[in-house]
């Protein structure tokens, strides 16, 4: 994300912790992105003119006179049909070596669709996995978290759900996946010929853990685009 020439540069930090920095700045909004000493950060708190920024890659080595530039907007995602079949990082940047996506730029973490205006979810999405279909039935429009210990075959279960579900699009958000897990999903979807209906946002163990906080909002933004604007069945 490029820094504009007219943006003010701050060079005096009030405080530095392991994950955050604080400084005095005017006219700053919550969730706004910034660059601190060349590292991407996000506003997590404002109190008067005291602004606290969470630095995604950590603050180690950042001096008190580091340059800070505010980018004037929160994280965004470009949404279009070009998202289909692609793997992205927590910032919506391609992980798969493909080109940047062109489309409408949408703020992530913004207001979601009002649940009172939605029809009550009732359309069953069969997965072919008896333990899920009988005991924890999935329905269209549902967000589904998978929690598992590292030694559990969660990637196999998630891939089966994605490949068996009768839907138009599958939005997968992976937090703290190993590089092997990421490659497993990519290879499974490609081998099954289903890659064109999968959109994945992945944070691997090699990337800063705090970036994982962006993954759910990225996935939800993509899901609402395909479900609401494209009128597709999305899981």
List the model feature ranges, each with a label:
Residues 2-8, 12, 16-17, 22-127:
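Acidic-enriched and Gly/Ser
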Residues 130-157, 163-235:
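Switch/coupling sub-region of P-loop NTPases
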